[in-house]
Curated annotation (Swiss-Prot):
Pfam families per UniProt: His_Phos_1
Keywords assigned: Gluconeogenesis, Glycolysis, Isomerase
Role played: Catalyzes the interconversion of 2-phosphoglycerate and 3-phosphoglycerate.
Gene that this sequence comes from: gpmA
Pathway(s) served: Carbohydrate degradation; glycolysis; pyruvate from D-glyceraldehyde 3-phosphate: step 3/5
Annotated organism of origin: Mycobacterium marinum (strain ATCC BAA-535 / M)
Protein name per its UniProtKB record: 2,3-bisphosphoglycerate-dependent phosphoglycerate mutase
Residues at the site labelled Transition state stabilizer: 183
Length: 251
């Protein structure tokens, strides 16, 4: 491992709205039973491969917090320091939050749907303050005036990377194994940075739920293996394909 620590990225287990194929964003939904099982299994994988975290970073959303708790429990690491920040939250999907992905695709067309869902710099329409799935009155975001009203991936990069550089990198430089339990788009933002992916290439990156992704970093914090290594590669490939297919109408 050398003087630089190891970074482990973990997307939360399947959420209730993942299962229902809804845009979630900052809406605070829980895990399905499948998602809880994924979280437990992720901790088992960490223990089996002797990749035990020294510190955990996660978001302010329960699907990530619960995943982190279950993973640490199954890896017998509940005692490690836990640091939470809104900067690790999922991308805010604006007015799309709560909408069915397949219905949204059918209504607006493939091109607009994919631009909102996967492009680097196209945000969805703004969510209306005070609406059902808005966070403007949520006390956890009082210090940031309720948070954003929409975001594209570039916005997530802008809010997450300074936190990574100013806070998380310090633990990596200290030789710690750092576990980040977050969300599909906040992790895509970080992977884009780590792997120097272009704005075009990041469009095709899909991160599966509940499978740890290991990055060994050199002294310059560059990945030893570009793209990292999933602890369960077969499950990761299947999970990424499932994420890519979201938006398809269910039979």
């Amino acid at each position: 491992m050398g003087d630089t620590g190891t970074l482990v990225l973990l997307r939360h287990g399947e959420s209730d709205w993942n299962a229902r194929n809804l845009f979630t964003g900052w809406v605070d939904v829980g895990l399905t039973e499948k998602g809880r099982a994924e979280a437990v299994r992720s901790g088992e994988l960490l223990a089996e491969q002797d990749l035990l975290p020294d510190v955990l970073y996660t978001s302010l959303l329960r699907r990530a917090i619960t995943t982190a708790h279950l993973a640490l429990d199954s890896a017998d690491r509940l005692w490690i320091p836990v640091r939470r920040s809104w900067r690790l939250n999922e991308r805010h999907y604006g007015a799309l939050q709560g909408l069915d992905k397949a219905e949204t695709k059918a209504r607006y067309g493939e091109e607009q749907f994919m631009a909102w869902r996967r492009s680097y710099d196209t945000p969805p329409p703004l969510i209306e303050k005070g609406s059902e799935f808005s966070q403007d009155a949520d006390p956890r975001y009082a210090n940031i005036d309720g948070g954003p009203l929409t975001e594209c991936l570039a916005d997530v990069v802008a809010r997450f990377l300074p936190y990574f550089t100013d806070v998380i990198v310090g633990d990596l430089r200290a030789g710690k194994t750092v576990l980040i339990v977050a969300h599909g788009n906040s992790l895509r933002a970080l992977v884009k940075h780590l792997d120097h992916m272009s704005d075009e290439d990041i469009v095709g990156l899909n991160i599966p739920t509940g499978i740890p992704l290991r990055y060994d970093l050199d002294e310059r914090l560059q990945p030893v293996v570009p793209g990292g290594t999933y602890l369960d590669p077969e499950a990761a490939a299947a999970g990424a394909a499932a994420v890519a297919s979201q938006g398809a109408a269910k039979a």
